[in-house]
Amino acid sequence: MLKSLLIIVIVFLHRELCDGIQLILFDNWPSAQNVCASAVADATANGQCTTKSIQKHLELLTVIILLKLFGVFHRINQQHGCSGDNSVKSASYAINAVASRTSGELDFVFVGPTCTTDIRTIGDFAEIWKSPVIGYEPVFEARGVQELTSVINVAQFSVGGVAETLVFLMKELEQVEITLVGSVKVLPNGLSLSNDLRSYNEIMNSFKIREYVEVDENDVDWTKVDQKIKRGARMIVVCADFYDIYSAFYNIGIRSLSGFRFIIVVILNKPPDEILNQPNVKNLLYGSNAFIISPLQEQYSDAFSIMQDVIPNLADDQFTTFLRIYHACYAYCVGSVNGAETQTDNYHTAMSGKAVTTKYGTFTFDNSGSVLTNYAVFTINPAEMTFESILTLKSVAKSCDTYNCFQLSPNKTSDLLWTLKDMDPPDDCVAKSSCVNYIPHIIAAVVIVTIIVIAIVIIVKQRRHKLNIYKLTWKVPKESLKIIVNKNADAKMQRELENRASNTDNAAALTSRRRVFGSYALVGTQRAEYVQFKQIRKINFPETTLDYLYSLKQLQHDNLAKFYGIQVNDDIMTMTILHTLVERGTLEEFCLDRDFGMDDTFKSAFMRDILKGLQYLHKSSIGYHGHLQASTCLIDINWVLKLTLYGVSNFMSDQLDAENIKVPEQAAHMITYPQYVCFPPEHIREYDDSGKQPPRVVRGSPKGDIYCVGMIFYMMVEREDPYHLIHSVERPNATLIKQILNENHMPRITDDYRQENMLLEMCKECWDRNPDKRPTIKKLIESISTVYPLSKGNLVDQMIRMSEKYADELEQMVAIRTADLADAQMQTMRLLNEMLPASIAKDLKNGLIMPPRSYESATVMFVQICDFNALMKRSSPEQVIAFLNDIYDQFDTVIKRHDAYKVETTGETYMVASGVPHENEGRHIFEVAEISLEIREISYIYVLQHDKNYKLRIRIGFHAGPIAAGVIGIRSPRYCLFGDTVNFASRMQSNCPPNQIQTSEITARLLFDSHEYKFVKRGIVHVKGKGEVNCYWLNEHLHEETEPPLPPMTPVPNPLRRGSIVPLQKA
C-alpha cells in the first residue's frame, strides 16, 4: 500500500513540474530500460519519432531518477514472474486515480507488463482511460481479438498461429487426433502453452485431443504418464513450457516413443535456438526424429549479435524477450509519429496494417493490432546438429474473424521426414505395455551365426591353403625344363652393337632393340631366365618354406616378371630358379647407353614402375625384393618395367648356408662387383679380394630395398655407375668395400643446381646407415611427382600428355610452323584411333575406365587375300608391304564410309566389326553387307603395280550374333572382340571360295526382309567346330537406279546338288 501511495505522489509531482508522462515501461530487468531507450533512439534517427516523443522519453528518465531517490525502482512491477502481490494491478489503480485527478490532461502509453494475465487487466483499465497498451508477451483472449482493442501486441507469437501450424502438419501427416502434453505450472511470463492451446481448440474445434496429459514437475509419476501417453493418439504434441526441458523430455521418453512409431511434435513460443540449444536436448530430439513448431526468426545469429551491442552480457534465453521490448518501444514511436497521439482508437487505427522496419528486421501489424508472425517446422540436421527448416508458414493479413486476423501460406522446403505418414501405426501392444522386444535376441543370434560362419570360412580357407601348399605348384619338373645355350651370343651381341651404332633413327633403334642371352631356359613352350646352382643333397622343405614358395608363385602384378618356379630334388642334382624372360633390355643397359635419350618421361615412368612393383612386394606376404639392381629391372616390349629375381635371395642364402647347394665352378658370377657394392651395407658379406670366388648371394629386407632404390635412381639421373666400376668385374677393390662398411662412403653428388637435385637428396636419405631413417615408398613417389610434375602415369598416359603439350607449344609458334602443328596433332589422333575406336580412345584419354561389356547383336567380317604365300615368294619384302598398305588403305576408305570399325589386320587377313562399340539398332548387318560388296568390287579392278598380270582374289565371310568386347591391356591397350560370333565369321571366311561373300543361313535371313540383296544358296557345308551349316553367297545389292553386273562366280561342289548354283528360296 505504501508503494502505491509513493507512486501516486511521484506521478502527481511530475504532473505539476512537467508537461506529462507519456511512456510507462513495466519490466523487472534492469537492461529493459536500455533496450527501450535504444529503440526510441533508433526510431528518432530513422525519422519515426516526433520531437515531442523525444521530450517525453527524457521526462521518463526524470521520473526514473525521482523513483530512485525515493528508494523505489523505476519498474512498477517489482516481483519476478507473475507470483506474489499483484503490484501491477496496484500500480494500475494508482495511475487511474492520478488520471482521474488531472481530468484527462495526463496521457499514458503503457509498454508491458511481463505477465500475460496483467496485460488483460491493464488493457481493461486502458479502455476506460483511452490510453493504449503495447504488449510484448503473447496473450490469448478467449473473448476474441476485437474485445481488447486497447492492446497492441508485438509478441510475434500467438496461440492461434501455432494451432493452425499444427493443423497443417496434421493434414500433411494424415493425422486427425493428438495427445497433448504440457506442464501444470505456467512459464515465468504467465503463459501456459498447453492450457491456451486446449482452450483455443475448444472454441475452434480444429482437431481432436484424445488425451490431455498435465505434468507436475515437482510431483509426478512418470510411469502413469507413460501409460497415458501410449494409450493416446499416434501424434504426441509436447508443449515446451517446462522449467527443466531436458528432464521432462527424457522422462516422457520421446526417443522410445519414436521407436514405437509415434510422431513427436514439440511446440515452442520462441525460436529453437533460444530454448533447445543445449547439446543434450538436441541429441535427444535428433534421436526421436521430432518435429519442432516455433515462431520463425530470420537471421537469428545476426540479430543476437546486434542485441549484444546494447546488452553485452546477453544470455541465450533472454534474446527474444528483449527483442519484443525493443519492438514495443519502437512501435510507440511509430504510432506517435503517425499522429495517433496516445488515444486508444487512433493508436489502434494507426498501427493496423502498418509495416515497421528496424535493424532487427521488418514486422507488420494485422487489423487487430497484433504483429503478423511467420512459423516454421524444424528438425535436427544430423551432420551439423543444427535446426533445419522443413516447412515454413507465412502469415498473411485478412479480415478479422472472432480469433484470427491472418491466414497461413505454407511452403515446403524439404521432404526429409514426410515419409513418416507412410509408416505403420504403433503396435497394439504398445498401449498395453505388453510388447516383447526380440531385437536383442535376433542380434545375438545373428552375431553368433556370423562368428560361426566366419570361423568355418577361416578353417576351410586355411585347410584349402594347406592343401595348395603341398601340391607344390611352384615345383618345375625336370621333364618340362630345357636349358638352351646360345653359342653365337658373342656374335649376336656384336651385331646388336653395330646396329645401334649405325642406326641414326632413334625411334627405330628403340623399337628393334633386344637383349642377347648366353643361355635361357624353356619351361614347356615358355622362355625363362634362370639362376642355377649345383645341388649337393636332397633338400627337405619345412612347411613355412613351402608356404613361402606357394605365395611367391601366386604373385601377379604388371611390374613383376612372373615367377615360374624352382626345379629341385631331381636326379640331375641341380636347383634352378626361373622367371619370365623379358627381351627388350635391362634398365642398366639403357642408363649406361649414352645414345639412348632418357628424358623426364622415361625416367618418371620407370621410377614409378619400380616403386609400384616394390610397393606390391612389400605389402604381400613376401615382403621384400632382396636382389634389387638396375640389372634386375627389365624393360619389356611395351616399355613397361618389370622386376625380376625378387623374393629368392634369402631362400638361396639359407640353402647356401646349409650347404645344400653351391655355385657351379664354371658358372659366371651371379653378382658382379659393381652390383655387389650397391647392396645395403647391413647385408654385404665379406668379399674375397683375390677375385677367385664370386660374391655370395646377399640377403634382403624391405629397408635394404629402399637403399637399392637410391642407387638405381642415382644411376638414372647421372647416367653412370654409382662407383664408376662398370669395368671392374674381374678385379675387385677390397678397399672400397671397407670404406662403404666403415667410413659411410657413398656415391658422389655434385652441388650443381639441377631440377633433379631434390631427387638426389632423397637418394642420400635412402643410403642412410640407419635403416629406420630411410624414406618410405610413399615419400619417394611424392618426390618423383615433385621433381617431374608434368610426367604422371605410365608411358601411354605420358605419351598422350606429351602430344598435347607439344601441340600447345606448336600453337604458340610463328605462322610458318602452324602447318607442322596441325600435322602433328592429326597424326597423333590418327595413331590413337587406329589402335582403338574413336569413342573408346576418347574415354581412355579422359581417364575413364572402360569395363568389358556384352552386345546382344553385332556383325563380324573377315577378308582374306587368296594365294598370298605364292605372291610373297615372287615378290620382295618391300613389294609385299607396299601391296598390303595399298590394298588395306583402300579397304579402310570403304570402312570410313560406313558405321563400322576395323578391328585389326594380321598378315593377309582383314577383320571388321559393326555394332560395337556403337550400337546402331540392327543396322550392323546391312553395313557389313555393303562393305563386303564394295571390298569385292575393289578386288575386281585392283592392279598390282609390280605385277600387272596378278589378279587379286579374296575370300569374305561374315556372321551376326551376340558378342563381348573390351579393352585388353593397360600399357598397350587394344579393343578386342570375343565370342562364338567371331569364330563363326572366321569359319565362314576360311570355308569360302575365292571372290565369294559367304554367310550362314541365320545371318542371311536377317537381310531377307529388305528385298535389296540377292543371295545364292551354296548348300550344306561342313564347318570345323560347327558341323553341317547351310551357307549362302551374297551376290549383289539391288539398287533402284541400275543393276550392276553379277561378279564372276566359281562353281563349288554342293553336297545337295553337284555342279549347280541354287538361287535362294525364301521361307
Curated annotation (Swiss-Prot):
Q: Which domain of life is it from?
A: Eukaryota
Q: Name one GO molecular function term.
A: protein kinase activity
What pairs make up the disulfide bonds? none
Q: Which residues lie on this side of the membrane: Extracellular?
A: 21-438
Database matches in InterPro entries: A/G_cyclase, Cyclic_nucleotide_synthase, Kinase-like_dom_sf, Nucleotide_cyclase, Peripla_BP_I, Prot_kinase_dom
Q: Which residues form the Protein kinase domain?
A: 509-791
Q: Cellular location of this protein?
A: Cell membrane; Cell projection, Cilium
Q: Which residues form the Guanylate cyclase domain?
A: 859-989
Query: Regarding domains, what does the record say?
Result: The extracellular domain may not be directly implicated in the detection of volatile odorants.
State the protein's name: Receptor-type guanylate cyclase gcy-10
Q: State the organism named in the record.
A: Caenorhabditis elegans
